[in-house]
């Protein structure tokens, strides 16, 4: 049966932990393999990217494979050809599909009509590869995840949704602060709470950060929301992670950001460049986690 990674929930409890530990092993050993020798990965990217593209291309190369990168300008993706036809054709040529797009429904359609593993490299609804990589960044420092308190400050966006899913399996405490009207998916929250996730919501950033070991944020206007920038700047006033907010966290708290960051908006320059910032470790860990995820889907 073909395996896919379209959201963190696809893993299940045991596989989530197996992949996390495997990613750490791969990082510690600077892992290379021939898993993808003679194989190719098609990368369909409707959204521009630096870290996602380079980390995935490097991951595939380090596992012995080759990549083919395509944007909408270079394909029929989103044009006259139905996506289901694209899925069928690309499955005949390739062994793995890595997709960065807007709607989650496009990932689901590629899964339904394709015959090769599909990895969600980002949608508007989730960013599972990034959050699994962030879990590796935390796990390296605090292996007992049940004793960890993570704070999320900002938008109830795709990153927030994937953090909620991660809380289901890794059992850390997740305190989340959003402006009114910018909360995450309610159905996902209900699902997570029913599964026993320890998630607490507030509209007060200081309350969310109080005692946190890891303080997370993201841009206020994601790709495709540029026309809302001014409106969001007003709504998110008071949600900037600055020295005063970090002072409310645990004494050894770390700052996290998936990048790219808008310094002076969701985070100050001082916090971003401080010793507490672990954003570059997060960026590096994309490579190691994505190798582990590729291995997981390819081994069936």
Swiss-Prot record:
Q: Which organism is it from?
A: Oleidesulfovibrio alaskensis (strain ATCC BAA-1058 / DSM 17464 / G20)
Q: Which PROSITE patterns match?
A: CARBAMOYLTRANSFERASE
Compartments in which it is found:
Cytoplasm
Q: What is the lineage of its organism?
A: Bacteria, Pseudomonadati, Thermodesulfobacteriota, Desulfovibrionia, Desulfovibrionales
Coding gene?
argF
Organism domain of life? Bacteria
Name of this protein: Ornithine carbamoyltransferase
What is this enzyme's class at the first EC digit?
transferase
Q: What is its EC number?
A: 2.1.3.3
Family membership:
Belongs to the aspartate/ornithine carbamoyltransferase superfamily. OTCase family.
